């Protein structure tokens, strides 16, 4: 999940390949891209990370059409003489980020002073409402809001699996946004997940990735609109 949240533009299959070959990778490029950087060198003889991409479709002699997968290599910055890219993320105001987390989501939200359950966020399926406690800690809200919103989007009758998949998605969402995820615990993997084939694992991860992408797209759309509005105000001045 760490790999998929960091390399979120990569497919699930390629995320698994990165994890299998270099789980500590941070910045991947093809050799030709690295070579365009002045003074670049590989650190000795390095094996590239083998990934897959869709090749050019072609027609076989029998008339059937084939779309092949082509193997290509990527190199991590740690395999080069270049310094690691400094991770810099501008601190986003909690109020703005919380608004982004609830922006245009598929559930209705209601803010209450106190929730009778004692939780900071509670999903009521009968009312189709997500209740949020006013004044709750932002770090808690990010995690629970993302988890409950994702859970509401999962179409399944298995509550145990729904809980686990929504927790995985919430972890990846918060990790991507730089929110502390140290309190997540994944020791409760459902028994049905433990015996999945590699194909079935990819399928489950693919569904989680789609949920994460949908949530992150809404967050990004809100943040872009805020940034655009801010630039317009600066221009008017």
Regions from the language model: what does each represent?
Residues 1-237:
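N-terminal accessory/interface modules of nucleic-acid-binding and processing proteins
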């Amino acid at each position: 999940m760490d790999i998929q949240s960091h390399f979120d533009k990569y497919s699930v299959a390629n995320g698994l390949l990165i994890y299998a070959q270099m789980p500590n990778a941070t910045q991947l490029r093809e050799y030709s891209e690295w070579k365009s950087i002045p003074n670049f060198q590989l650190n000795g003889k390095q094996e590239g990370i083998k990934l897959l991409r869709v090749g050019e479709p072609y027609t076989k002699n029998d008339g059937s059409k084939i779309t092949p997968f082509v193997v290509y290599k990527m190199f991590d910055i740690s395999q080069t003489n270049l310094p690691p890219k400094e991770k810099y993320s501008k601190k986003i105001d909690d109020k703005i980020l919380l608004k982004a987390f609830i922006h245009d989501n598929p559930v209705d939200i209601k803010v209450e002073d106190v929730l009778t359950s004692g939780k900071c966020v509670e999903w009521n399926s009968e009312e189709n409402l997500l209740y949020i406690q006013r004044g709750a800690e932002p770090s808690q809200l990010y995690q629970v809001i993302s988890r409950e919103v994702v859970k509401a989007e999962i179409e399944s009758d298995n509550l145990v699996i729904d809980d686990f998949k929504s927790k995985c998605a919430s972890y990846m969402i918060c990790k991507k946004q730089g929110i502390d995820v140290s309190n997540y615990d994944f020791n409760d993997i459902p028994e049905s997940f433990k015996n999945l084939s590699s194909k079935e694992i990819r399928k489950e991860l693919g569904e989680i990735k789609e949920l994460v992408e949908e949530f992150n797209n809404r967050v990004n759309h809100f943040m872009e609109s805020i940034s655009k509005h801010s630039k317009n105000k600066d221009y008017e001045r």
